[in-house]
Structure formats: C-alpha cells, structure tokens
Amino acid sequence: MRLAYWIYEGTAHHGIGRIANSLKGVHAVFHAPLGDDYVNVIHTMLERTPNFPRATTSVVTGRDLAQGTNRLPDTLRQVEERFKPELIIVSASCSTTLLQENLQLIVGNANIDTEVFIYEVNPFRVQETEAAEGLFTALVKKYAEKQDLTEEPSINIIGPASLGFHVRSDVTSLRRMMATLGVKINVVAPYSAGLADLKKLPAAWLNVVPYQELGHGAAEHLEEKFGMSSMYDTPLGIQPTMKWLNELIEKLNAIGAKNGKSSNLKMPPLTAFSFDGMSAPSGVPWFTHSADMESFSMKRAFVFGDATRTVAMVKFLRDELGMEICGAGTYLHKHAAWVREQLAGYLPDDLIVTEEFQEIAKRIEADMPDLVCGTQMERHSCRKVDVPCMVTSAPTHIENHLLGYYPMLGFDGADVIADRVYTTSKLGLEKHLIDFFGDAGLEYEEEQQEKVAEPALATAGETAGQATEAATAPATPGAPLTGEPVWAADGEAMLKKIPFFVRKKAKLNTETFAKENGYATITAEVVRLTKESLGGG
C-alpha cells in the first residue's frame, strides 16, 4: 500500500536511469511492462536540458509472455541504430524481475556491436539511491585506468548526477572556487562525463565527493586501486567552505610534494571569490548581525531530507543563523548512523529515520516550528498547517529545477540559502502583520472554512437561547469532558489575535485545557486561563 502514497525514494531502475542520463554516450534499456516507463517522463518533465532522456523501455506485455516472445533483442538493435551509444545498460524493473529471465542469454540474441552492460539488482531490497551508487561504482571499476598525474593541481568532482538537487549550480559554484585557487577540474562524474572521462579519473590529484549518497563507492575504489586521496566533506555554509578550502589546499600541496609536482597553492584574499573581485564572497556573516536577521535568532527549525542536506542544513541553521533545531530526520536508513554521528550535540531528541511522510507531517503539526527545511512532501504538509517551509532536499518538484544559478555549496550557496530562509520566514511575518493590523484592502487569502462556531449548533437539542447564554456566561470549570468543547465568538476572536504560525498549536492547547477542566464552551476567558496555565503572562 505504500506505493499508493508519496514515497521519498524512487525505484531501483529510476536510480539506474539517473546514472545513464548523466553519462554521455550511454543509453539505458529497461526490460519492463508499460507501467514502468515513467523514468522517461520524470526526466523529460524535471531535467532542464534540451536533450531527451538517455533511456528506452523494452515493453513486456501479457501477450508476449503467453507466446513466449521477447522484444528486448529488437529494442537493443533499434537503440544501436538510432542513438549509436558507446554503451548500453540493460536492467529489469521490479515487475519483470519476477520472471527470473536470463538477461545475458536474451541480450546475446540481439547480435549487436555495441557493448552491453547488464546491471542486475534486487529491486525489492534496493531503491533509487543505492542502485545509482552501485551502478556508478561498477562503471568506475570497469573503465578507470592507470594514468599519469596531471602536471598542474587538479581534482575530480564525483557525485553530481542527473535530477540531483541543484547539482548543476553546485558544480558551477565549485568550478568558480577552483578557478580562483588555480586548480584544474579533471572530470565531473557522472554528470556530463563520458566513458573516456571515467578512464582518466586516476589522472587527478584529488577526488572531491561532496554528497554522501553518491560517489563514495567510486572514490573508495580509486583510493584502493590507484592510491588516490579523497575529500568527503560538504562545503555548505561559510564555516564549512572555509575549512574545506584550507583542507583542499593542504592536501593538494602535500600530494604535489609527494609526487614531485610543482604546487604552491595558497589561500587568496577572500574578495577573490566574489563575483566582482572586490567585495566579500558572501553576505551571510554581516547579514546575520543585521536587524532583520537578529529576529531569526533562536527561532525553531525542523529539518528533514537526505543524509547530506539534513546534516548540512542543521549545522548551517544553528551555527551560522543562530536558529534552534527542534528536530531533524532522514529517509535514508543506510545513512542514518552517519547522520547521527555528524549531528551529535545538535538535536534535542533522537534522529527521526522514516520513509513514511505521514510521521513527519504529524511531528511538524505537533511541534509547529517557525521554519521547516525538507522535501516537496514537507512543503505540502506544511501548507496544510500554515508553517513556512523551504525545499532543501530531494524529492523535489519542477519548481526546484530552475534555469537560474541557485547553488547550495560554497560561498554562493550560503547566500542562496540565507535568502531562502529569510524570504520564506519573512512572508510569514508579513501575513501575521496583515492579520494583526488589517489587510488595507489587500485581497489576502483567508481561511474561510474556519468560521466562528454558531452557538445555536453547540450541542444537539440545545436551543439558540441556551447556547447564546452559555457563550456569554462566565467560564466555570466542571468534570472533564468526554466530547469536544464548543468555541464561542469571543473565544474565536481572541484566537485570531494569536500569530498564525502558532495559532493551531494554541487552539489545540486551549481545547485540551477545556476538556481536562470541564469547560463545555471556550470563551475568551478560557483562552486566557489556558495561557496562564502554560506560564504565559
């Protein structure tokens, strides 16, 4: 039944499609029924490139199964003739895996000249992230060859992939910083790399692996087989970026000295990293001390997403913006231990590890934080409870695959994130001001469904006069209620004076107080008593 709801990770063959669509000269062929051809649709809708997805579905139908025929050989011949790829990756979807067919034998019947790589994975145990990591690691093992080191300091950027969260802008940000340092980019993989690029991966001095989800297996293989060094930190935020740059310079100089290469890299003035070469590379340090951002200090934030962004956003929000983290979690069970280790001392309670978006929605509704950083699922959940939310992790929707330059990494990324935090929360403050002072003629959407409860409908069989009398009479406690209390007009009016971003929680607290203390009707006095019971003035 889980597939009837939103899921955080795609299927295994979706992950395979992401790798195939990232690599030049590579084409994926999925042995799958018609319903499993959604990979092409997802890439066509979300990937902002002029190219069609590098994937084809070899459709399996009920008639084919009944007649004992197989379309895969014909599909392979068509793909070779039309796309002329250097490599074809063949994989079965979760549905056709149940047929337990010998793909090697079927592929052999195609008699094509193009090299075919069959990637078999158990789709019932492996999902998108693990499948993508496994395939990319396998391809690096297959194609990487011994190379002489480049004469000048160089790095590989390993991990960016098709449909990754802001990866195109992240790569641009990393390229800008490397150009400032005078460091060459040897290969970016898998995003935009070809098979020839995979072969020359060992020519770089250092591997940079900014994402926890993709690239670790490939980097570890390059370390074991070719003795390469790697950096696995994520330069998200000012402090992590500074630390990352200094470590990068230190490692490259050490590798150069070890291999007899000329390398005397030094940290340039920070202004060199800015767009104009004269100003600070990021406005975050001074902006956090401005009057506007001071109001964010100790605001409560909740973070959920993949491993990389959950860790990085928690640290950025607390360490650089001064926000209080009221909770965090990830949907990647295999990376949960790493996330816990990285966030030791940052969280008020245990890390949430779940693939059920309903659990996160309930937690958000219970905590009512000032800001949520999550996936598109959290964006939908927050909209229902009127909590400000910014999307900082996959899964995403089309509005998170932008044409402009919106990195998450580096100095540029710090500015983008700070802007998003500010505008996301600032709009919430604006709505509160409109609620408080009036809309001045603005057509601001009001929650029309939250009408003031009519006293006449308070309880079954109660007359309008009795209900009105109950609404205006002084609040008197009684035995705990078994039913739900009724809101009087003055109680509703007082509730609307409470800022919208804590209004729902205040309403729940008031109703709980009323039931526990026997108030059948919630008047303004009951709202005040609730506030006093919770320590409010």
UniProtKB/Swiss-Prot annotation:
> Where does the record place the region Disordered?
459-483
Gene3D superfamilies for this protein: 1.20.89.20, Nitrogenase molybdenum iron protein domain (3.40.50.1980), Proto-chlorophyllide reductase 57 kD subunit B (1.10.8.550)
Record keyword ATP-binding present: yes
Tell me which EC number(s) this protein carries. 1.3.7.7
The answer to whether the entry has keyword Metal-binding is yes
Residue sites binding [4Fe-4S] cluster per the record: 36
Q: What GO molecular function terms would the record report?
A: 4 iron, 4 sulfur cluster binding; ATP binding; metal ion binding; oxidoreductase activity, acting on iron-sulfur proteins as donors; oxidoreductase activity, acting on the CH-CH group of donors, iron-sulfur protein as acceptor
Which keywords does UniProt give here?
4Fe-4S, ATP-binding, Bacteriochlorophyll biosynthesis, Chlorophyll biosynthesis, Iron, Iron-sulfur, Metal-binding, Nucleotide-binding, Oxidoreductase, Photosynthesis
GO BP annotation list: light-independent bacteriochlorophyll biosynthetic process; photosynthesis, dark reaction
The domain of life is Bacteria
Q: How is the cofactor bound?
A: Binds 1 [4Fe-4S] cluster per heterodimer. The cluster is bound at the heterodimer interface by residues from both subunits.
According to UniProt, the reaction catalysed is: chlorophyllide a + oxidized 2[4Fe-4S]-[ferredoxin] + 2 ADP + 2 phosphate = protochlorophyllide a + reduced 2[4Fe-4S]-[ferredoxin] + 2 ATP + 2 H2O
Q: Which cofactor does it need?
A: [4Fe-4S] cluster
Record-annotated active site: 292
Which amino acids does the record list as binding substrate? 428-429
Q: Which HAMAP family match?
A: ChlB_BchB
Sequence similarity: Belongs to the ChlB/BchB/BchZ family.
Q: What is this protein for, i.e. what is its function?
A: Component of the dark-operative protochlorophyllide reductase (DPOR) that uses Mg-ATP and reduced ferredoxin to reduce ring D of protochlorophyllide (Pchlide) to form chlorophyllide a (Chlide). This reaction is light-independent. The NB-protein (BchN-BchB) is the catalytic component of the complex.
Name of the protein: Light-independent protochlorophyllide reductase subunit B
Species annotation: Chloroherpeton thalassium (strain ATCC 35110 / GB-78)
Task: Supply the source organism's classification.
Answer: Bacteria, Pseudomonadati, Chlorobiota, Chlorobiia, Chlorobiales
Encoding gene per record = bchB
